[in-house]
Amino acid sequence: MFNLNQTKKASLPIKMRIRKGDTVQVINGKEKGKTGEVLKTLPIENRVIVQGINLRTRHVKPTQEGESGRIVTEEASLHASNVMVYSTKQKTASRVEVFIDKDGSKKRRLKKTGELID
């Protein structure tokens, strides 16, 4: 027999090449073509939250007496496969390549343009 109330086994975080602060472009879905800054990454779920993209309205109940309820608009997460890092200089989206620099440190660069991200 199996238990229907079993929770999903916690998975390990995925190594993401997108980081907080990166400018990304949405490549799939209803927000396709829009760009924004990554506010937060969720590596266990392989998702990102992008500023001004995938907005959802949420109704918030009052928490204290005398306070009224309100409607809050906030960003919902997107799957990381639906965004690409965007170069503001070249105005193009590209995949990210991780390479080891001459001094032995790991760096990220755009595959299409060769531009260093950090």
Curated annotation (Swiss-Prot):
Signal sequence annotation: none
Q: Which UniProt keywords apply?
A: Ribonucleoprotein, Ribosomal protein, RNA-binding, rRNA-binding
Q: Which GO terms describe its molecular function?
A: rRNA binding; structural constituent of ribosome
What does the entry list under GO cellular component?
ribonucleoprotein complex; ribosome
Which InterPro entries would you find in this protein's record?
KOW (IPR005824), Rib_uL2_dom2 (IPR014722), Ribosomal_uL24 (IPR003256), Ribosomal_uL24_CS (IPR005825), Ribosomal_uL24_KOW (IPR041988), Translation_prot_SH3-like_sf (IPR008991)
Query: Pfam families from the entry?
Result: KOW (PF00467), ribosomal_L24 (PF17136)
Organism's domain of life?
A: Bacteria
Annotated GO biological process: translation
SUPFAM superfamilies for the chain: Translation proteins SH3-like domain
Alphabetized Gene3D superfamilies for the sequence: 2.30.30.30
Q: How does it assemble?
A: Part of the 50S ribosomal subunit.
So what does this one do? One of two assembly initiator proteins, it binds directly to the 5'-end of the 23S rRNA, where it nucleates assembly of the 50S subunit. One of the proteins that surrounds the polypeptide exit tunnel on the outside of the subunit.
Q: Which family does it belong to?
A: Belongs to the universal ribosomal protein uL24 family.
UniProt-recorded name of the protein: Large ribosomal subunit protein uL24
The gene it comes from is rplX
